A protein has these predicted regions:
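NAD(P)H-binding glycine-rich loop region in Rossmannoid oxidoreductase-like domains
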Residues: 44-84
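NAD(P)-cofactor binding segment of oxidoreductase domains
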Residues: 76-104
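Conserved C-terminal active-site "lid" loop/helix of NAD(P)H-dependent oxidoreductases
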Residues: 220-226, 245-290
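Rossmann-fold cofactor-recognition segment
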Residues: 33-46
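Catalytic helix-loop patch of NAD(P)-dependent Rossmann-fold dehydrogenases
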Residues: 83, 88-91, 111-153
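Mid/C-terminal beta-alpha module of Rossmann-like enzyme folds, strongest
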Residues: 198-199, 205-252, 278
């Protein structure tokens, strides 16, 4: 029986991973910062704790879904962001190498500066501008340095079972006649379910490396909100605002990529795997909320 250790198992992707493998001959070691039913408490920033658990369980695969993902908070919490987003992946990679486990690490579009004019591929040079992006970039470096067999999946605009943009918009629609949403940031909304499927597809293979993993197609946040409202039958008006206008309304907010469209180039090069169109993935997700 294959044994998989998942960190951040209570997050959007962690939950989707467990659901994706449901019914298969797989044993999960579910970990998160807090202990719970069927969940082992693990502080990934503590190398001794990570090594102790991995040595005891000897998993075949480690999937790191844990991260400090609050982009604005990262600007004020550099130390915490580095510990979770960089040191954590380092510790897991050290442990994975020791027991011969595959290391799967989830990263982000924020490793790019975000001012491009064409989709970023895995071969484009990274240049993060936010604390979140910089700490995630360091996490990638540690994985490459310490893990023998690894997959790094960069994703973007993720939503799933948990707090996310889709649910925030639907909640606002229940109490507001109109909402203001940024219209000049381009990206690819990606469901946690689709990302989990991609990870599941590549995990048994030897196609190691860095992969972009977003749903196909692209949009902007305001248009994404409109697509959500349309599918939910909401009449809430979406006011399109620029990033500059948003920054004035929220001065503590971090810099966000204006253009963060990722091309899943490595997936296409290795075995032709294709993720769903973002509209189709959103349709599937909205049905789960009915």
């Amino acid at each position: 029986m294959k044994k998989i250790l998942v960190t951040g198992c209570n997050g959007q992707l962690g939950r989707a991973i467990r659901q994706e493998y449901k019914g298969e001959d797989v044993s999960f070691i579910n970990t998160d910062v807090a202990e719970g039913e069927g969940i082992v408490a693990l502080d990934i920033t503590d190398v001794n704790a990570v090594l102790a658990l991995v040595r005891a369980e000897r998993p075949d695969v480690i999937i790191n879904c844990a991260a400090h993902t609050n982009v604005d908070a990262c600007e004020q919490q550099w130390d915490a962001a580095y510990r979770i987003n960089a040191i954590g992946p380092r510790n897991l990679s050290i442990a994975a190498r020791e027991v011969g486990a595959k290391m799967i690490h989830v990263s982000t579009d924020y490793v790019f500066e975000g001012n491009g004019t064409k989709p970023y591929t895995e071969y484009d040079e990274i240049h993060p501008v936010s604390a979140y992006g910089k700490t995630k970039a360091e996490g990638e470096k540690f994985v490459r340095e310490f893990a023998d067999r690894y997959f790094i999946f960069r994703t973007a605009w993720l939503y799933g079972d948990g707090k996310n943009f889709v649910k925030t918009m639907l909640r606002l629609a229940d109490s507001h006649d109109e909402v203001s949403v940024v219209c000049d940031q381009q990206g690819s909304p990606t469901s946690a379910v689709e990302l989990a499927r991609a990870i599941h597809h590549f995990e048994p293979t030897e196609n190691y490396g860095t992969f972009h993993a977003t749903c196909e197609g692209d949009t902007n946040w305001a248009a994404f909100a409109e697509a959500i409202f349309k599918r939910a039958g909401k009449t809430t008006k979406v006011n399109h605002v620029t990033s500059e206008q948003y920054a004035k309304m929220n001065p503590a907010s971090a810099n966000r990529p204006a253009y963060s469209i990722l091309e899943n180039y490595m997936m296409k090069l290795t075995d032709g795997y294709k993720m769903a169109e973002w509209q189709d993935a959103l349709d599937e997700y909205m049905k789960t909320l009915e």
